[in-house]
UniProtKB/Swiss-Prot annotation:
GO terms for molecular function: electron transporter, transferring electrons within cytochrome b6/f complex of photosystem II activity. The 4 large subunits of the cytochrome b6-f complex are cytochrome b6, subunit IV (17 kDa polypeptide, PetD), cytochrome f and the Rieske protein, while the 4 small subunits are PetG, PetL, PetM and PetN. The complex functions as a dimer. It is found in: Plastid, Chloroplast thylakoid membrane. It comes from Chara vulgaris. Belongs to the PetN family. This is Cytochrome b6-f complex subunit 8. Component of the cytochrome b6-f complex, which mediates electron transfer between photosystem II (PSII) and photosystem I (PSI), cyclic electron flow around PSI, and state transitions. HAMAP family: Cytb6_f_PetN. InterPro entries: Cytochr_b6-f_cplx_su8_sf, Cytochrome_b6-f_cplx_su8. One of its GO terms (biological process) is cytochrome complex assembly.
Length: 29
C-alpha cells in the first residue's frame, strides 16, 4: 500500500464521518 491510497482512504473516512455528523445534527439526534 502506497501513501496515496492510504491518504485517499483516510480522506473518504473523514468525509463520510463529517457528512454523517451533519445529517445527524440536522435530524436532531
Amino acid at each position: 500500500m502506497d501513501i496515496l491510497s492510504i491518504s485517499w482512504a483516510f480522506l473518504m473516512v473523514v468525509f463520510t464521518f463529517s457528512l454523517s455528523l451533519v445529517v445527524w445534527g440536522r435530524s436532531g439526534l
